[in-house]
């Protein structure tokens, strides 16, 4: 197919920023989970599995404690073998890191792009990694009228940039996106993959939350191992509830993996992480149970929030983005509940909040607290 076969060309504006320096959107705490500076009983600001860590992973971590006098396996052999079997891909096409964030940085160091394209709003870690090579970061702004979905418009703009020799060297996309929870349609993402591979644009797909959705069969891992320009990144953090362990992985061609491996320090995956990861891969039933439960609770929370008069965006992950004119962050913090203030996300503003989908009783406590603070505000 030629470029013109894909779509007609329409121009839109993309805002460019030299480098990825911190501005008003990133100078605040750029992640949720700020429990170290706040007295919190319920933390809805981090998108972790509502069931927490699987028992099998807890046991593996307990057993591994007694082995920590040893160095970890530098080749991550057992975990790599188990992952290759689970994904049905060659072991040489998988690379583990100290969380997905380390892998994003390694990708930037290896590819050395001059220009990097990210969506707005999206995970700030992409900008952070781009700053390691002082790349020019450009943003494609998603529209709330489109439910923050990536539409055909993006494909058309990418085509225009390719024809004008203005295309970025590297693109970060998240599927589903964070903080919106919105997934990219398979048709759109397929067109983007085709364009990037055809025109030598490195495409990094962040699938860290895909296991919470019903779109696991749309993963691009199997595609990535046959491409020189596609990389898929995932993490154990969210689905297995182990952010403190730090374990992420990517799938790419063998040649790409070898290139990326050279950017990582030796022993970057701890012994604890390797044992936890191997145990986690045995938890298929746990993942399935989580996905089903999260879907029901997400729908439940969406309905309850809308009944309170809040604007909620329809996502597919284990979190929800909503809007209120009230300062809900401070109001709920007084009740020892922490939600994610999304005003420091580029493309969002004051009034946008993200909450994790948790267990029924915790979700009910949040709704009750919101009813109370909103009722008090209305009385005033």
Model-flagged regions — what are they?
Residues 1-21:
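Short, Lys/Arg-enriched N-terminal segments with co-localized hydrophobic residues
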């Amino acid at each position: 197919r030629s470029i013109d076969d894909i779509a007609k060309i329409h121009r839109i504006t993309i805002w460019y920023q030299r480098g990825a320096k911190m501005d008003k959107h990133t100078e605040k705490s750029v992640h949720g989970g700020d429990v170290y500076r706040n007295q919190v009983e319920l933390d809805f600001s981090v998108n972790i599995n509502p069931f927490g860590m699987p028992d099998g992973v807890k046991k593996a971590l307990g057993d591994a404690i007694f082995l920590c006098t040893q160095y970890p396996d530098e080749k991550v052999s057992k975990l790599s073998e188990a992952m290759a079997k689970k994904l049905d891909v060659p072991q040489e096409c998988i690379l583990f890191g100290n969380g997905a964030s380390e892998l994003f940085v390694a990708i930037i160091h290896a590819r050395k792009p001059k220009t990097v394209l990210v969506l707005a709003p999206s995970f700030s870690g992409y900008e952070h990694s781009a700053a390691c090579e002082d790349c020019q970061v450009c943003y494609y702004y998603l529209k709330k009228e489109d439910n923050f979905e990536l539409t055909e418009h993006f494909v058309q703009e990418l085509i225009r940039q390719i024809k004008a020799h203005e295309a970025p060297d590297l693109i970060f996309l998240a599927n589903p996106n964070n903080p919106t929870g919105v997934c990219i349609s398979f048709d759109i993402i397929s067109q983007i993959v085709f364009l990037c591979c055809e025109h030598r644009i490195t495409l990094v797909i962040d699938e860290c939350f895909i296991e919470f959705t019903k779109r696991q069969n749309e993963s691009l891992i199997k595609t990535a191992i046959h491409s020189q320009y596609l990389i898929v990144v995932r993490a154990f953090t969210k689905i297995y509830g182990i952010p403190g362990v730090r374990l992420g992985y990517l799938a790419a061609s063998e040649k790409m993996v070898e290139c990326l491996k050279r950017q990582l320090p030796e022993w970057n995956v701890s012994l604890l992480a390797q044992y936890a990861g191997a145990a986690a891969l045995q938890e298929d039933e746990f993942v399935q149970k989580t996905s089903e439960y999260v879907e029901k609770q997400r729908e439940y929370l969406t309905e309850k929030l809308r009944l309170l008069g809040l604007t909620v965006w329809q996502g597919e992950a284990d979190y929800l983005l909503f809007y209120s004119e009230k300062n809900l962050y401070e109001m709920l913090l007084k009740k020892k509940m922490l939600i994610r203030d999304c005003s420091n996300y580029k493309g969002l503003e004051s009034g946008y909040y993200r909450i994790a989908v948790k267990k029924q009783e915790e979700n009910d406590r949040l709704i009750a607290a919101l009813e109370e603070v909103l009722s008090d505000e209305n009385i005033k």
